């Protein structure tokens, strides 16, 4: 609710990408997002890991498994009144894919998209027990502002997780999201889904 409320407060429409399980568990959230005019798309059905972390050129899924997972994802979108043609882009699980996955998606009429690396906005899922991989909300905010100062953020896609582990009590969307939007609006940025 914090993300939706913050975006509404600032008159911003966002893009939300969920797994099939999320669509099944939280249809009321999906309906609210649609009613408020946000883009809602696929993040796969089962959040499969497509390839090993150590070898991006190999695969852990077959084309058939990939296509079945994506079709199941789009079936859940359809149940939420989102038609295939209205959700032509998707963010792969773990934001991790290769050219083969991109080609398979393209053959299904789906375009792979991903966040712009560098801002660390995607690190809002990390928890303190992850040691050096943990990124506090202040760190993420400061990194976004650092990138903005060095190169600007025009065209950047920032990824923030709709929900995070309870072990992360420092939720970016509880304060820093609002602060970031205010700061970027003051600098003349506009936001698009």
Per-segment meaning from a language model:
Residues 1, 17-27, 90-99, 133-137, ...:
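Acidic-and-aromatic substrate-binding clefts and catalytic sites of carbohydrate-active enzymes
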Residues 1-58, 71-88, 180-183:
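Active-site beta->alpha N-cap acidic-glycine motif
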Residues 4-15, 28-31, 119, 130, ...:
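Terminal accessory/targeting
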Residues 14-18, 39-42, 86-92, 111-115, ...:
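Structural recognition of the beta-strand scaffold that forms the well-ordered cores
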Residues 21-24, 39-40, 45-50, 94-99, ...:
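Solvent-exposed loop/turn segments at secondary-structure junctions
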Residues 50-64, 125-137:
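Acidic/histidine-rich helix-loop elements
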Residues 60-68, 134-138, 170-174, 178:
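Non-membrane alpha-helical structural segments and their capping/turn regions in soluble enzymes
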Residues 101-148, 189-193:
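His/Asp/Glu-enriched short active-site or ligand-binding loop at hydrolase and phosphoryl-transfer sites
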């Amino acid at each position: 609710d914090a993300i939706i409320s913050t975006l509404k407060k600032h008159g911003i429409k966002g893009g939300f990408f969920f797994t099939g399980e999320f669509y099944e568990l939280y249809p009321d959230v999906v309906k609210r997002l649609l009613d408020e005019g946000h883009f809602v798309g696929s993040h796969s059905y089962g959040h499969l890991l497509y390839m090993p972390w150590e070898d991006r050129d190999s695969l852990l899924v077959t084309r058939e498994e990939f296509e079945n997972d994506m079709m199941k994802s789009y079936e859940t979108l359809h149940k939420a009144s989102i038609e295939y043609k209205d959700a032509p882009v998707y963010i792969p699980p773990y934001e991790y894919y290769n050219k083969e996955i991109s080609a398979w998606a393209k053959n299904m009429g789906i375009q792979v998209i991903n966040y712009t690396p560098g801002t660390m906005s995607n690190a809002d899922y990390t928890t303190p027990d992850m040691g050096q991989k943990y990124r506090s909300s202040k760190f993420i905010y400061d990194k976004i502002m650092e990138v903005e100062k060095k190169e600007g953020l025009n065209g950047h896609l920032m990824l923030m997780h709709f929900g995070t582990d309870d072990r992360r009590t420092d939720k970016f969307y509880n304060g820093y999201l609002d602060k970031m939007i205010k700061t970027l609006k003051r600098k003349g940025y506009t936001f698009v889904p």
